[in-house]
Protein backbone atom coordinates (compact mmCIF):
# COMPACT_ATOMS: atom_id res chain seq x y z
CA UNK A 1 0.00 0.00 0.00
CA UNK A 2 2.79 2.45 0.85
CA UNK A 3 4.37 2.01 -2.56
CA UNK A 4 1.10 2.51 -4.44
CA UNK A 5 -0.41 5.21 -2.21
CA UNK A 6 2.59 7.28 -1.10
CA UNK A 7 6.03 6.46 -2.46
CA UNK A 8 5.44 6.07 -6.20
CA UNK A 9 2.75 8.78 -6.58
CA UNK A 10 4.92 11.36 -4.79
CA UNK A 11 8.00 10.48 -6.83
CA UNK A 12 6.06 10.48 -10.10
CA UNK A 13 4.45 13.86 -9.40
CA UNK A 14 7.51 15.70 -8.07
CA UNK A 15 9.95 14.43 -10.69
CA UNK A 16 7.38 15.01 -13.41
CA UNK A 17 7.03 18.66 -12.37
CA UNK A 18 10.79 19.21 -12.32
CA UNK A 19 11.34 17.39 -15.59
CA UNK A 20 8.70 19.53 -17.32
CA UNK A 21 10.70 22.66 -16.40
CA UNK A 22 13.99 21.10 -17.47
CA UNK A 23 12.45 20.02 -20.76
CA UNK A 24 11.19 23.54 -21.52
CA UNK A 25 14.57 25.12 -20.84
CA UNK A 26 16.42 22.40 -22.76
CA UNK A 27 14.18 22.96 -25.79
CA UNK A 28 14.86 26.71 -25.66
CA UNK A 29 18.67 26.52 -25.41
CA UNK A 30 21.25 24.13 -26.85
CA UNK A 31 23.60 25.02 -24.00
CA UNK A 32 21.02 24.07 -21.37
CA UNK A 33 20.13 20.94 -23.33
CA UNK A 34 23.75 19.78 -23.15
CA UNK A 35 24.06 20.77 -19.48
CA UNK A 36 20.90 18.99 -18.39
CA UNK A 37 20.60 15.98 -20.73
CA UNK A 38 22.25 13.60 -18.28
CA UNK A 39 20.41 15.07 -15.28
CA UNK A 40 17.07 14.73 -17.06
CA UNK A 41 17.81 11.13 -18.04
CA UNK A 42 18.90 10.26 -14.50
CA UNK A 43 15.72 11.74 -13.02
CA UNK A 44 13.39 10.18 -15.59
CA UNK A 45 14.92 6.72 -15.17
CA UNK A 46 13.35 5.95 -11.79
CA UNK A 47 10.36 8.18 -12.62
CA UNK A 48 9.49 5.82 -15.48
CA UNK A 49 10.33 2.84 -13.27
CA UNK A 50 7.82 4.03 -10.66
CA UNK A 51 5.10 4.56 -13.28
CA UNK A 52 5.66 1.10 -14.74
CA UNK A 53 5.93 -0.55 -11.34
CA UNK A 54 2.60 0.87 -10.16
CA UNK A 55 0.92 -0.04 -13.43
CA UNK A 56 2.29 -3.58 -13.34
CA UNK A 57 1.33 -4.19 -9.72
CA UNK A 58 -2.25 -3.13 -10.45
CA UNK A 59 -2.59 -4.98 -13.76
CA UNK A 60 -1.14 -8.21 -12.41
CA UNK A 61 -3.25 -7.97 -9.24
CA UNK A 62 -0.18 -8.36 -7.06
CA UNK A 63 -1.86 -6.88 -3.98
CA UNK A 64 -4.58 -9.56 -3.97
CA UNK A 65 -1.94 -12.27 -4.36
CA UNK A 66 0.05 -10.91 -1.42
CA UNK A 67 -3.10 -10.63 0.71
CA UNK A 68 -3.95 -14.27 -0.04
CA UNK A 69 -0.40 -15.29 0.88
CA UNK A 70 -0.61 -13.36 4.15
CA UNK A 71 -3.99 -14.91 5.02
CA UNK A 72 -2.59 -18.40 4.42
CA UNK A 73 0.47 -17.59 6.50
CA UNK A 74 -1.58 -16.25 9.39
CA UNK A 75 -3.77 -19.37 9.38
CA UNK A 76 -0.71 -21.63 9.30
CA UNK A 77 1.07 -19.71 12.09
CA UNK A 78 -1.94 -19.89 14.41
CA UNK A 79 -2.33 -23.64 13.83
CA UNK A 80 1.30 -24.74 13.80
CA UNK A 81 3.48 -22.40 15.87
CA UNK A 82 3.78 -21.14 19.43
CA UNK A 83 3.32 -17.45 20.36
CA UNK A 84 6.88 -17.32 21.67
CA UNK A 85 8.25 -18.11 18.20
CA UNK A 86 6.98 -14.77 16.90
CA UNK A 87 5.37 -15.96 13.69
CA UNK A 88 1.82 -15.23 14.83
CA UNK A 89 2.40 -11.49 15.16
CA UNK A 90 4.97 -11.07 12.36
CA UNK A 91 2.43 -9.48 10.01
CA UNK A 92 1.10 -7.24 12.79
CA UNK A 93 4.62 -5.96 13.43
CA UNK A 94 5.01 -5.12 9.75
CA UNK A 95 1.63 -3.38 9.55
CA UNK A 96 2.17 -1.37 12.74
CA UNK A 97 5.64 -0.30 11.60
CA UNK A 98 4.43 0.85 8.17
CA UNK A 99 1.43 2.69 9.62
CA UNK A 100 3.53 4.24 12.38
CA UNK A 101 6.04 5.63 9.89
CA UNK A 102 3.54 6.74 7.23
CA UNK A 103 3.52 10.49 7.92
CA UNK A 104 7.26 10.80 8.61
CA UNK A 105 8.10 8.67 5.56
CA UNK A 106 5.87 10.79 3.31
CA UNK A 107 7.35 14.06 4.62
CA UNK A 108 10.92 12.83 4.27
CA UNK A 109 10.33 11.65 0.71
CA UNK A 110 8.82 14.99 -0.34
CA UNK A 111 11.80 16.88 1.10
CA UNK A 112 14.33 14.55 -0.51
CA UNK A 113 12.66 14.51 -3.93
CA UNK A 114 11.70 18.18 -4.11
CA UNK A 115 14.64 19.85 -2.36
CA UNK A 116 17.58 17.59 -1.55
CA UNK A 117 17.76 16.06 -5.04
CA UNK A 118 16.08 18.71 -7.18
CA UNK A 119 17.40 22.13 -6.09
CA UNK A 120 20.98 22.30 -7.28
CA UNK A 121 22.19 25.43 -5.50
CA UNK A 122 22.10 23.44 -2.27
CA UNK A 123 24.88 21.15 -3.52
CA UNK A 124 27.79 23.64 -3.39
CA UNK A 125 26.33 25.20 -0.24
CA UNK A 126 26.28 21.80 1.46
CA UNK A 127 29.85 21.02 0.40
CA UNK A 128 31.17 23.86 2.60
CA UNK A 129 29.09 23.10 5.71
CA UNK A 130 31.80 21.28 7.65
CA UNK A 131 34.70 23.37 6.35
CA UNK A 132 36.55 25.53 8.89
CA UNK A 133 39.47 26.40 6.63
CA UNK A 134 40.18 25.81 2.94
CA UNK A 135 43.56 24.10 2.83
CA UNK A 136 43.64 23.40 -0.92
CA UNK A 137 41.96 26.26 -2.82
CA UNK A 138 42.95 24.86 -6.22
CA UNK A 139 41.23 21.56 -5.52
CA UNK A 140 38.12 23.30 -4.19
CA UNK A 141 37.95 25.48 -7.29
CA UNK A 142 38.35 22.46 -9.56
CA UNK A 143 35.38 20.76 -7.86
CA UNK A 144 33.25 23.90 -8.11
CA UNK A 145 34.10 24.44 -11.78
CA UNK A 146 33.02 20.87 -12.51
CA UNK A 147 29.67 21.56 -10.83
CA UNK A 148 28.98 24.90 -12.52
CA UNK A 149 29.95 23.60 -15.97
CA UNK A 150 26.55 21.87 -16.08
CA UNK A 151 24.58 24.38 -14.03
CA UNK A 152 22.15 27.04 -15.24
CA UNK A 153 21.06 29.42 -12.45
CA UNK A 154 17.88 30.51 -14.25
CA UNK A 155 16.72 26.92 -14.69
CA UNK A 156 17.53 26.04 -11.10
CA UNK A 157 15.65 29.11 -9.87
CA UNK A 158 12.55 28.04 -11.84
CA UNK A 159 12.83 24.52 -10.44
CA UNK A 160 13.30 25.83 -6.90
CA UNK A 161 10.16 27.96 -7.10
CA UNK A 162 8.00 25.02 -8.18
CA UNK A 163 9.59 22.65 -5.70
CA UNK A 164 9.06 25.05 -2.80
CA UNK A 165 5.39 25.36 -3.74
CA UNK A 166 5.08 21.57 -3.75
CA UNK A 167 6.83 21.21 -0.40
CA UNK A 168 4.56 23.79 1.20
CA UNK A 169 1.47 22.03 -0.22
CA UNK A 170 2.45 18.41 0.39
CA UNK A 171 4.95 18.16 3.26
CA UNK A 172 3.34 17.66 6.64
CA UNK A 173 6.49 18.48 8.61
CA UNK A 174 8.39 21.48 7.26
CA UNK A 175 11.95 22.59 8.03
CA UNK A 176 12.10 25.50 10.48
CA UNK A 177 13.23 27.91 7.75
CA UNK A 178 9.65 27.98 6.45
CA UNK A 179 8.23 29.40 9.69
CA UNK A 180 11.26 31.41 10.81
CA UNK A 181 12.24 33.00 7.50
CA UNK A 182 9.71 32.44 4.72
CA UNK A 183 6.61 33.15 6.81
CA UNK A 184 8.07 35.92 8.98
CA UNK A 185 10.08 37.83 6.38
CA UNK A 186 8.24 37.00 3.17
CA UNK A 187 4.67 36.50 4.34
CA UNK A 188 4.76 32.86 3.26
CA UNK A 189 5.56 33.79 -0.36
CA UNK A 190 7.94 31.04 -1.46
CA UNK A 191 8.56 32.65 -4.87
CA UNK A 192 9.75 35.87 -3.23
CA UNK A 193 11.97 33.87 -0.89
CA UNK A 194 13.53 31.91 -3.77
CA UNK A 195 14.29 35.16 -5.61
CA UNK A 196 15.91 36.52 -2.44
CA UNK A 197 17.99 33.35 -2.05
CA UNK A 198 19.27 33.31 -5.63
CA UNK A 199 19.86 37.08 -5.69
CA UNK A 200 21.91 37.02 -2.48
CA UNK A 201 23.62 33.63 -2.23
CA UNK A 202 27.31 33.29 -2.93
CA UNK A 203 26.58 29.96 -4.57
CA UNK A 204 24.16 31.23 -7.25
CA UNK A 205 27.06 31.79 -9.66
CA UNK A 206 30.42 30.22 -10.40
CA UNK A 207 32.15 33.59 -10.04
CA UNK A 208 30.69 34.15 -6.59
CA UNK A 209 31.68 30.68 -5.40
CA UNK A 210 35.25 30.91 -6.70
CA UNK A 211 35.64 34.32 -5.05
CA UNK A 212 34.35 32.81 -1.82
CA UNK A 213 37.02 30.09 -2.01
CA UNK A 214 39.68 32.82 -2.29
CA UNK A 215 38.21 34.79 0.62
CA UNK A 216 36.66 32.06 2.76
CA UNK A 217 35.31 32.79 6.21
CA UNK A 218 33.00 30.82 8.48
CA UNK A 219 30.99 33.97 9.20
CA UNK A 220 30.40 34.66 5.51
CA UNK A 221 29.39 31.04 4.91
CA UNK A 222 27.01 30.89 7.86
CA UNK A 223 25.27 34.10 6.78
CA UNK A 224 24.62 32.83 3.25
CA UNK A 225 20.88 32.18 2.64
CA UNK A 226 21.56 28.90 0.82
CA UNK A 227 23.57 27.63 3.80
CA UNK A 228 20.84 28.72 6.22
CA UNK A 229 18.31 26.83 4.11
CA UNK A 230 20.35 23.67 3.67
CA UNK A 231 21.12 23.46 7.40
CA UNK A 232 17.41 23.71 8.19
CA UNK A 233 16.59 21.09 5.55
CA UNK A 234 19.27 18.65 6.71
CA UNK A 235 18.20 19.03 10.35
CA UNK A 236 14.61 18.17 9.43
CA UNK A 237 15.69 15.18 7.34
CA UNK A 238 17.74 13.87 10.27
CA UNK A 239 14.79 14.41 12.61
CA UNK A 240 12.43 12.51 10.29
CA UNK A 241 14.93 9.66 9.88
CA UNK A 242 15.30 9.39 13.66
CA UNK A 243 11.51 9.33 14.06
CA UNK A 244 11.33 6.27 11.81
CA UNK A 245 14.21 4.34 13.31
CA UNK A 246 12.27 2.28 15.88
CA UNK A 247 9.53 1.34 13.44
CA UNK A 248 12.13 0.45 10.82
CA UNK A 249 13.64 -1.97 13.33
CA UNK A 250 10.18 -3.39 14.06
CA UNK A 251 9.52 -3.79 10.33
CA UNK A 252 12.86 -5.56 9.82
CA UNK A 253 12.13 -7.97 12.67
CA UNK A 254 8.61 -8.66 11.42
CA UNK A 255 9.76 -9.18 7.85
CA UNK A 256 12.53 -11.55 8.95
CA UNK A 257 10.01 -13.65 10.88
CA UNK A 258 7.53 -13.57 8.00
CA UNK A 259 10.07 -14.85 5.46
CA UNK A 260 11.38 -17.47 7.90
CA UNK A 261 7.80 -18.56 8.55
CA UNK A 262 6.97 -18.82 4.85
CA UNK A 263 10.01 -21.04 4.34
CA UNK A 264 8.95 -23.21 7.24
CA UNK A 265 5.35 -23.30 5.98
CA UNK A 266 6.48 -24.41 2.51
CA UNK A 267 9.58 -26.55 3.12
CA UNK A 268 9.56 -28.12 -0.36
CA UNK A 269 9.47 -24.82 -2.25
CA UNK A 270 12.67 -23.59 -3.91
CA UNK A 271 13.38 -20.13 -2.48
CA UNK A 272 15.53 -17.62 -4.34
CA UNK A 273 18.28 -16.00 -2.28
CA UNK A 274 18.57 -12.24 -1.83
CA UNK A 275 20.51 -11.05 -4.88
CA UNK A 276 21.72 -7.80 -3.31
CA UNK A 277 25.52 -7.44 -3.19
CA UNK A 278 26.03 -10.64 -5.19
CA UNK A 279 27.31 -11.54 -8.62
CA UNK A 280 24.21 -12.54 -10.57
CA UNK A 281 23.94 -15.31 -13.13
CA UNK A 282 20.78 -15.60 -15.20
CA UNK A 283 19.99 -18.75 -17.12
CA UNK A 284 16.99 -20.30 -18.83
CA UNK A 285 14.88 -19.55 -21.91
CA UNK A 286 14.33 -16.04 -23.27
CA UNK A 287 10.70 -15.66 -24.37
CA UNK A 288 8.30 -12.85 -25.35
CA UNK A 289 6.16 -11.24 -22.64
CA UNK A 290 2.33 -11.23 -22.81
CA UNK A 291 1.11 -8.69 -20.20
CA UNK A 292 -2.52 -8.73 -21.35
CA UNK A 293 -4.83 -10.34 -23.88
CA UNK A 294 -3.77 -9.40 -27.40
CA UNK A 295 -0.56 -7.64 -26.29
CA UNK A 296 2.86 -9.18 -26.82
CA UNK A 297 6.28 -7.66 -26.20
CA UNK A 298 9.14 -9.38 -27.96
CA UNK A 299 12.51 -9.89 -26.33
CA UNK A 300 14.35 -7.96 -29.05
CA UNK A 301 14.04 -4.53 -30.67
CA UNK A 302 14.17 -3.85 -34.40
CA UNK A 303 15.15 -0.64 -36.15
CA UNK A 304 11.77 -0.69 -37.94
CA UNK A 305 9.99 -0.90 -34.59
CA UNK A 306 11.96 2.01 -33.16
CA UNK A 307 11.46 4.22 -36.22
Question: Model-flagged regions — what are they?
Answer:
Residues 1-307:
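Terminal presequence/propeptide segments associated with secretion/organelle targeting
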Amino acid sequence: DRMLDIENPQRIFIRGERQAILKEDMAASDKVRIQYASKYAQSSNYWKNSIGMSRGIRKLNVKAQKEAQEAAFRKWAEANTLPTEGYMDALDRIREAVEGNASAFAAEQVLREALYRAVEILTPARSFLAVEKITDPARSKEAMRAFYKDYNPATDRRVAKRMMQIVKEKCGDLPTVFAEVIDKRFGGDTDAYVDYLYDNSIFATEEGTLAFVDDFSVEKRDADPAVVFVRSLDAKLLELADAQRENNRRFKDGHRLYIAGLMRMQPDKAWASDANFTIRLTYGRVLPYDPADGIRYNYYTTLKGVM
